[in-house]
């Protein structure tokens, strides 16, 4: 049976969506961001700082209040009453004392040998050696030794408190065993101020005088362990030890009594040195006019003028009762004027030392 030819019904169109509401107005775009400001110009580079020096690390630089303060005059009174808060600078006298101590304590190059001489005995040569050595030992940080090189029994060992009976001769008898400082120290007595003293033989029965070869051998040992070696020479200039002492001496101290014969003897000492090839030593020497009394009959000022024309420095040491006794010397028991004189003497002698080169960066 034939299927009738029929047309499919047309589809019903979908309903139209409702119209959209009108679009809202778009917001205005934000204003453009301004460009960032240019970076500031770099600050000018400071000049290169000076290379730091050791002086930049001084006490005054690093401590708010340096230790200590003025010790005399009105400056000391202000410092003490303020409990250390006020620290006025020291006065002229105190500055002068500090300057003397700085000269005494300056580093030296190598071992310095100081010979203390006098043409005649009894003028204070041994006393000068002991006091000069004590001042050096008190103010320096290195080792200082005084040696009695008297060919006869000397008295240097009597001017200190002995802590050993050993002598220079004993040291020389064992010289091949001296390898360290402690080995040498066993033959020396040490004072409270750190001065070491090697005494001479005290037994007059010993028939061997301290002579030229003895001193050469002793000096060769001491210069290995000490910065300063003071030699208390015997009276006169002709005994054999002087043939070793004078050629090796770096500094010479000539002791004179404040009298006509004492001054003449000291002047003759300088004459002899100049005639025998020691003109440099004589010209650089320091003369000590010893035991000067306030009301002496000799014009000490004229003596001082005479020696000032012949040597490097002249120092007066006043008479002192503590030294007159010939007993053990204690610096603190000296009169203040005597103490000042020995400090001045030490500074004058130290002025002749060659200074150690300043250490610093290469």
Say what each PLM segment does.
Residues 22-23, 42-115:
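Extreme N-terminal, non-catalytic leader segments
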Residues 139-196:
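Phosphate-binding loop that captures ATP/GTP phosphates
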Residues 291-335:
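Beta-strand-loop-alpha "switch" segments that mediate conformational coupling across diverse proteins
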Residues 1-64:
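Intrinsically disordered, low-complexity Pro/Gly-rich regions
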Residues 186-192, 196-239:
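Phosphate-binding/switch loop-helix module in NTP-utilizing enzymes
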Residues 96-101, 111-151, 156-159, 173, ...:
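Walker A/P-loop phosphate-binding motif and the immediately C-terminal alpha-helix
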Residues 223-227, 239-260:
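Inter-motif core of Ras-like GTPase G domains
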Residues 326-362:
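NTP-binding/hydrolysis catalytic cores, primarily Walker-type P-loop NTPases
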């Amino acid at each position: 049976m034939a299927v009738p030819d029929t047309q499919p019904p047309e589809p019903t169109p979908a309903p139209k969506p409702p119209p959209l509401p009108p679009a809202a107005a778009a917001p205005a775009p934000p204003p453009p961001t301004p460009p960032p400001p240019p970076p500031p110009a770099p600050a000018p580079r400071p000049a290169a700082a000076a290379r730091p020096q050791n002086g930049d690390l001084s006490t005054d630089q690093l401590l708010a209040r340096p230790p200590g303060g003025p010790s005399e005059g009105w400056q000391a009174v202000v410092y003490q009453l303020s409990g250390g808060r006020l620290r006025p600078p020291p006065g002229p006298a105190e500055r002068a004392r500090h300057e003397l101590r700085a000269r005494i304590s300056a580093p030296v190059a190598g071992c310095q040998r100081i010979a203390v001489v006098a043409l005649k005995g009894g003028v204070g040569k041994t006393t000068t050696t002991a006091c000069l050595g004590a001042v050096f030992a008190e103010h320096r940080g290195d080792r200082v030794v005084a040696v009695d090189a008297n060919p006869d029994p000397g008295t240097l060992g009597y001017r200190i408190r002995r802590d050993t009976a050993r002598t220079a001769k004993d040291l020389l008898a064992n010289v091949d065993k001296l390898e360290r400082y402690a080995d040498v120290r066993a033959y020396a007595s040490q004072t409270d101020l750190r001065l070491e003293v090697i005494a001479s033989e005290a037994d007059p029965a010993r028939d061997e005088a301290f002579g030229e070869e003895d001193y050469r051998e002793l000096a060769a040992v001491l210069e290995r362990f000490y910065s300063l070696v003071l030699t208390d020479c015997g009276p006169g200039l002709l005994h054999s030890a002087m043939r070793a002492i004078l050629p090796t001496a770096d500094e010479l101290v000539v002791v004179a009594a404040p009298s006509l014969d004492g001054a003449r003897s000291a002047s003759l000492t300088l004459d002899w040195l100049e005639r025998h090839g020691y003109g440099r030593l004589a010209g650089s020497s320091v003369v000590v006019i010893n035991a000067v009394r306030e009301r002496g009959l000799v014009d000490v000022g004229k003596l001082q003028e005479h020696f000032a024309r012949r040597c490097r420095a002249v120092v007066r040491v006043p008479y002192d009762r503590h030294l007159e006794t010939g007993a053990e010397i204690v610096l603190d028991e000296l009169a203040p004027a005597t103490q000042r004189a020995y400090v001045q003497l030490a500074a004058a002698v130290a002025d002749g030392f060659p200074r150690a080169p300043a250490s610093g960066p290469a």
